[in-house]
């Protein structure tokens, strides 16, 4: 694939059920990455669209339009960026939005690109404004204006940039400014995985890692993985530890269930903190409504952790509803905790994500 440079600012997260990379997980995660669109599991619509974009560019002998990959963490945006470069036979340069604090940081990176290179900017919604404004011109006209000097004597020197393809990844497409978003010729929206797709991901990972994984065990892990391949692979490694230490190393369905109970991952993929949030919401606040800051204090966590890590899955799973007055526990949340929902519980008589 040629040159590879990484300057990513992934912030480690220690929770088993967080879709963010954990400390020391990067190398393992990289070993499991697919190397081509053919190896990439899931996201069939995105794969088809990308194949057309890339094949069209190769047939013309040019560079593809700039590509934006949008979706929750852990779904394979970084893997797709690497695949894009590999499919084009191009070199890949990797950085992240938070790492580009000044326009000069970006100018230095752009000036080192050669024709047909792929520049991947992770968390592109967090790029500093001066760097973002420089990126506009680079994306459109393949040049940048570098300001030399200060004050009235400052001069702008135009520098040519080799034709390249920018691949941006974001978990918050709404946080992108309009001018930046409009400069991407193609946007891929990535969705959570179906359990059957995660079973295929797990089977592939087990083969690479030399793990003996039964089909029923794979299904058990998949349905607790929040629709996220990164979480599925992490749970696979934790279950492997359990199987090797407390059994014969073979992962059966029962072994998977016992292991996930040890790691506090329940049958719906909720972990200790998720259940603590639901417990506080139902037992301490009568089901709500309650503000996220108050809820965070009740469980001893930062409000941003509850809002950005726990809440999205709990809302998607039908456990919590957002209202103008605050968060409310649904009937499914009460039932999941083994309690009878009140008569006025949100969603009473309706089915949730896992029903």
Curated annotation (Swiss-Prot):
Chain spans, region Head domain (RuvB-H): 267-355
Annotated transmembrane regions: none
Subcellular location: Cytoplasm
DNA damage in keyword set: yes
CDD domains: AAA
Gene3D superfamilies per UniProt: 1.10.8.60, P-loop containing nucleotide triphosphate hydrolases, Winged helix-like DNA-binding domain superfamily/Winged helix DNA-binding domain
Residues given in the record as ATP binding sites: 32-33, 74, 77-79, 140-142, 183, 193, 230
Example GO BP: DNA repair
Principal location class: cytoplasm
Region Large ATPase domain (RuvB-L), residue ranges: 1-193
InterPro entries reported for this sequence: AAA+_ATPase, AAA_lid_4, DNA_helicase_Holl-junc_RuvB, P-loop_NTPase, RuvB-like_N, RuvB_C, WH-like_DNA-bd_sf, WH_DNA-bd_sf
Residue segments, region Small ATPAse domain (RuvB-S): 194-264
Cellular component per GO, a single term: Holliday junction resolvase complex
Free-text note regarding domains: Has 3 domains, the large (RuvB-L) and small ATPase (RuvB-S) domains and the C-terminal head (RuvB-H) domain. The head domain binds DNA, while the ATPase domains jointly bind ATP, ADP or are empty depending on the state of the subunit in the translocation cycle. During a single DNA translocation step the structure of each domain remains the same, but their relative positions change.
Protein name per UniProt: Holliday junction branch migration complex subunit RuvB
Lineage: Bacteria, Bacillati, Actinomycetota, Actinomycetes, Mycobacteriales
């Amino acid at each position: 694939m040629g040159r590879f440079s990484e300057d990513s600012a992934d912030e480690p997260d220690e929770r088993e059920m967080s879709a963010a990379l954990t400390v020391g997980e990067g190398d393992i995660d990289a070993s499991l990455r697919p190397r081509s669109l053919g190896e990439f599991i899931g996201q069939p619509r995105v794969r088809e669209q990308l194949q057309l974009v890339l094949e069209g560019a190769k047939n013309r002998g040019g560079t593809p339009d700039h590509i934006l990959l949008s979706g929750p963490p852990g779904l394979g945006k970084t893997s797709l960026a690497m695949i894009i470069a590999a499919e084009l036979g191009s070199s890949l340069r990797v950085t992240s939005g938070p790492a580009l604090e000044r326009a000069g940081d970006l100018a230095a990176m752009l000036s080192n690109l050669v024709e047909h290179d792929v520049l991947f900017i992770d968390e592109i919604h967090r790029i500093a404004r001066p760097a973002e404004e420089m990126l506009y011109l680079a994306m459109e006209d393949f040049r940048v204006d570098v300001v030399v000097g200060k004050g009235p004597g400052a001069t702008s020197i135009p520098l040519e940039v080799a034709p390249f393809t920018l691949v941006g990844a974001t978990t918050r497409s709404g946080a992108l400014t309009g001018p930046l978003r409009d400069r991407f010729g193609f946007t891929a929206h990535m969705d959570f995985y179906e359990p059957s797709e995660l079973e295929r991901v797990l089977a592939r990972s087990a083969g690479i890692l030399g793990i003996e994984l039964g089909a029923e065990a794979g299904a058990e892990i998949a349905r607790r993985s929040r629709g996220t391949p990164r979480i599925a692979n992490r749970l696979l490694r934790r279950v492997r530890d359990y199987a090797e230490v407390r059994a014969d190393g073979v992962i059966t369905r029962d072994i998977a269930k016992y292991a996930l109970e040890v790691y506090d991952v329940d049958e719906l993929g909720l972990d200790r903190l998720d259940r603590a949030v639901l417990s506080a919401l139902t037992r301490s606040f009568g089901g709500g409504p309650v503000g996220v800051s108050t809820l965070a204090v009740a469980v001893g966590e930062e409000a941003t952790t509850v809002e950005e890590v726990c809440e999205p899955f709990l809302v998607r799973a039908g456990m919590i509803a957002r209202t103008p007055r605050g968060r409310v526990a649904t009937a499914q949340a009460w039932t999941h905790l083994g309690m009878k929902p009140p008569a006025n519980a949100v969603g009473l008589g309706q089915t949730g994500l896992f029903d």
